[in-house]
Amino acid sequence: MVRYSKLAFRQLVRVYDVDVCFTPMIYAKNFIESEKCRSSELSVCEGDSPLIVQFATDDPFVLSEAAEMVYKCSTGVDLNCGCPKHDVRSKGFGSALLSKPELLADMVRQTRARIPDPDFSVSLKIRINHDIEKTVDLCRKAEAAGVTHLTVHGRTPSQRAEPIDIQALRIVKDSVSVPIIANGGITTREEALFLAEQTGVDGIMAANGLLDNPALFAGHEHTPSDCVENFMRLSREYGLDWLLYHQHLQYMLRPVFSAQQRRVFNELNGRLAIDHFLNNLLDI
């Protein structure tokens, strides 16, 4: 998730049965060249594990260099090959890479050569192609290059809210031997279990669903009040920017706000005002 899966939020979802966390997508070249980028984009703590750092690049050397820089503070790197946003695609990153399976295989190969540690994962996050055989070919090339696992979003780059393609996910799972993580449209624990049962995949990733409900995988239908309280505490502890703090809470509390409460909350300015509003709302 671009911007959102910072340290405080990762530590929050770990409380509610998330097994592995990913960082926000980070531009690998900026990360290598800028100390400011590294300090703002990647903060970790002792309990922030397993952690996979997700990068955006189209350069095998840059990916392997960035991977080496995070080797000691993470459990793996992931290359974003699925982001459909125009500003990402225009750089040749994200889903623009799906048409270049040989390049992706080379990026995996060079990164694995730089870090041969089998406990450090090198993975790809992709979207499916309208021609599923092209997706299978990409996955097989990545597998041959040494990819640790693949996260497959069950929509094409041009799709947004359409139902995910369960059959396509099943075909990909049956075509390779590396673990497959399915992604797309998960909003409840029941949906995650159903998708795993229908496709046989090895794991389920949620993104937007966790923004709305960080306790999703623990079986909560909506964000429970203790989750909000935990997020308030963790955000203070890890210094989460108040604007991002505000945005997270807008997602989490959307189902419980009245229209009037939503208008008031959206106009709040600063952490103190936000916390005062929440203390009254939650009777903390």
UniProtKB/Swiss-Prot annotation:
Q: What class of enzyme is it?
A: oxidoreductase
Q: Which PROSITE patterns match?
A: UPF0034 (PS01136)
Q: Which GO terms describe its molecular function?
A: flavin adenine dinucleotide binding; tRNA dihydrouridine synthase activity
Family, similarity comment: Belongs to the Dus family.
Entries under Gene3D superfamilies matching the protein: Aldolase class I
Q: What does this protein's UniProt record list under function?
A: Catalyzes the synthesis of dihydrouridine, a modified base found in the D-loop of most tRNAs.
Query: What is the name listed in the Swiss-Prot or TrEMBL entry for this protein?
Result: Uncharacterized tRNA-dihydrouridine synthase-like protein C45G9.2
What PANTHER family is this protein classified in? Answer: TRNA-DIHYDROURIDINE SYNTHASE, TRNA-DIHYDROURIDINE(20A_20B) SYNTHASE [NAD(P)+]-LIKE
